[in-house]
Amino acid sequence: LRQDPDIIVIGEIRDEESLDIALKASLTGHLVFSTLHTNDAISAITRMLDMKAKDYLIASALSLVIAQRLVRKLCEHCKRKSAKHYNEFEGDFYEAVGCELCKMNGYFGREMVSEFLFIDEEIAELIRTNAKTSEILSYARKKGFKTMFEVGLQRAREGKTSIDELLRVIK
């Protein structure tokens, strides 16, 4: 029985063989989704190189890398403006308090903070030429890339999560 799927989902890429299959499937016209354990989107490229993938295959096969984390959401009923001043961050922030609704936790539910690294021709060329992670990040920032921490900081400014929670999860 021959199969020719348009979309391939690989649960997790853990070894060189799985990575090679995923990259080659992508190059032959398949849309491939998978997971890879890294701290951020740009580190996924480094991880693939560490797994012996060829730079030109990565550059040609990748379209998008997403990194994400879940942060606890502040309870809407009991959160309060924080009296703490975070010298390195501008803005007003909120903190967890605790009430019956959130079972005295101060948090209720979770929210995703993520970063999206779109692989355009320039980033593909940076990958092919073994550019440093910092060079890729610098270029991506010029194109509007926001790190998970920056996205999380915005969520904290909006009162959706706390700085303490953000630092616990991301830093």
Where do the language-model regions lie?
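Short, flexible helix-loop junctions that flank or precede catalytic/ligand sites
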Residues: 1-171
